[in-house]
Amino acid sequence: MEKTTRRLPIVERDEWLQPVEAQMNLRHERYERKMADIGRSAGSLVDYANGYRYFGWQWDDVLDGWWLREWLPGAHDVYVFGDFNNWQRTEIRMHKDAAGVWSAFFPAAMYRDRLRHGSLYKIHVHGDNGWLDRIPAYARRVVQD
């Protein structure tokens, strides 16, 4: 049985697109799958696009400190390290929630003098392929040594 695909309106309006209609349909299907994935994982495209407001380093006025959050659903264990802890890989363990978000809280009382703008850091991730040092996905600035 042959799959019937509804013709995209743009192809109906522009006959010059008919030779590439199959490729356009594949791209459109891939787009729809990705949008469905985003809807399931983030709730909406807006929430997905605003991830930078939740992930990475975020100041918490109520708790008076910084949160570091990273989405790593397949990770078994995650640590954060950097110049603020003398690059000790396994000193600060992050905690995983049910959605696969790993987080660590840095109270200002303890880290005010060590954690500052321009601090260098990485995450140490234990996955199926072993331990790796990574640059966090939501890092806003990276430097190469």
Model-derived regions: residue spans:
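The feature marks proteins involved in alpha-glucan
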Residues: 1-63, 67, 87-91, 96-145
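Short proline/glycine-enriched turn/loop motifs at strand-loop junctions of beta-rich domains
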Residues: 71-78
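Conserved aromatic beta-strand anchor motif in extracellular beta-sandwich/beta-rich domains
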Residues: 80-82
